[in-house]
Regions:
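Hydrophobic ligand-binding cavity/cleft-lining segments
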Residues: 1-36
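Short strand-connecting beta-turns/loops that link adjacent beta-strands
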Residues: 2, 66-67, 91-94
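Short amphipathic alpha-helical segments
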Residues: 2-5, 127-131, 135
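Acidic, low-complexity intrinsically disordered regions
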Residues: 17-18, 68, 79, 101
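Glycine-rich portal/gate segments that line the openings of hydrophobic small-molecule binding cavities
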Residues: 29-76, 96, 130, 134-148
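Beta-strand/loop substructures that line and gate deep hydrophobic ligand-binding cavities in soluble
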Residues: 74-130, 141
Length: 148
C-alpha cells in the first residue's frame, strides 16, 4: 500500500467504497461538488459514527497533495474554523498516517472558541482517537483485499 493509494481513495471515494472500509460505522463519503483537477474545491458529504456520536457534515478540500496530504475545511452551511488533515508518508512496507483536527478562530473570533470546545470535547477527542486507530489499519484490507 502507498500513500498515493490512500489519498486517491479518499479523494475519489464513493458511499459504497467508504462503507466497505468499515461497515456499519462508515456510512457515507461522496462528492457533492467538484473543484479543480487536483480536487481542491471539491465538497464531500461525510457521515460516520465516532464512538456513539453520529457525525454528519460537508467538508471542502482546501489543500491536496496526492500521495502526501488532504485538508478538508468543515462546513455547516458556512465554512467553519475547523479542518481535518490527513497526512501520509510512505515507509518500508507500510504507510504512516497522521490524522489531525484543528479548530479555532484567529483574531477577535477567538472569543467564540469556547463554543467549539463544547463540540470538540475531551470525550470526543478520545472517541476520535480510538476511531482513527481502528479505521486506518482497516484501509489496507480495503485497498488490497487478501485472496479468499
Amino acid at each position: 500500500m502507498t500513500g498515493a493509494e490512500v489519498t486517491d481513495f479518499l479523494s475519489e471515494c464513493t458511499d459504497a467504497g467508504y462503507q466497505k472500509w468499515w461497515p456499519g460505522v462508515h456510512l457515507h463519503l461522496r462528492p457533492v461538488a467538484v473543484g479543480n483537477v487536483d480536487h481542491v474545491g471539491d465538497a464531500v458529504f461525510m457521515d460516520e459514527f465516532i464512538g456513539k456520536r453520529r457525525l454528519r457534515m460537508t467538508a471542502v478540500v482546501v489543500e491536496a497533495e496526492p500521495g502526501r496530504k488532504i485538508v478538508w475545511q468543515l462546513k455547516k452551511g458556512i465554512c467553519l474554523p475547523a479542518w481535518l488533515t490527513i497526512e501520509v508518508t510512505d515507509r518500508a512496507g507500510c504507510v504512516h498516517v497522521r490524522h489531525t483536527i484543528t479548530a479555532g478562530w484567529t483574531g477577535p473570533g477567538r472569543i467564540l472558541d469556547p463554543l467549539l470546545k463544547m463540540y470538540f470535547s475531551p470525550r470526543f477527542a478520545a472517541a476520535m482517537d480510538r476511531h482513527v486507530h481502528t479505521e486506518f489499519p482497516l484501509i489496507r484490507e480495503r485497498l488490497h483485499p487478501t485472496a479468499q
